Design a protein with these regions (language model features):
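NAD(P)+-binding Rossmann beta1-loop-alpha1 motif at the extreme N-terminus of oxidoreductases
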Residues: 1-55, 59
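Rossmann-like NAD(P)(H) cofactor-binding subdomain of soluble oxidoreductases
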Residues: 49, 57-62, 66-121
Length: 121
C-alpha cells in the first residue's frame, strides 16, 4: 500500500476511475487521499468513497506528496495557477490530454517533477 499522501485534481471519468481502482484494489488508503473537482456531483461521488475532500486545488496540493492532475485541457492552466505555490518538492502525474510535460512545467515555473500518463480507454 502506498503510504504517501495522494492528491487528485479532477475526479471525472478518468480521474475518478483511476482513483476508484486504486482504492478498491487496496493500493491507496482513503485516509491518505485528497480530492477536488469543480463539479459538485464529482465531489459527492468522491465523498462516498471516504476520501478527504479538499476546499480547492491548492488545498489538494498542500496536503499531498503526489498529485494526479486529471482535468480537461482547457482547465489545466487555472488549476495549476491555484496550486503553483504549494507544489515545491512535490511530484505530479498528469493525464491531461494533449498537454506536454514542457507546457505543464511552463504553467508552474517548472518546480515539481512531472510524469505524463496516457491512459487508453
Amino acid at each position: 500500500m502506498v503510504t504517501k499522501k495522494i492528491g487528485v485534481i479532477g475526479c471525472g471519468n478518468m480521474g475518478g476511475a483511476i482513483l476508484y481502482g486504486a482504492l478498491e484494489s487496496g493500493v491507496l488508503a482513503k485516509e491518505n487521499v485528497y480530492v477536488y473537482d469543480i463539479n459538485p456531483a464529482m465531489m459527492e461521488k468522491a465523498k462516498g468513497w471516504g476520501v478527504n475532500l479538499a476546499a480547492d486545488d491548492e488545498d489538494v496540493c498542500k496536503n499531498s506528496d503526489i498529485i494526479l492532475l486529471a482535468v480537461k485541457p482547457q482547465n489545466a492552466a487555472e488549476a495549476l495557477e491555484q496550486c503553483k505555490k504549494a507544489l515545491d518538492g512535490k511530484a505530479m502525474m498528469s493525464i491531461v490530454a494533449g498537454v506536454t510535460v514542457e507546457r505543464l512545467q511552463a504553467m508552474i515555473d517548472g518546480t515539481p517533477r512531472i510524469l505524463r500518463l496516457l491512459p487508453n480507454t
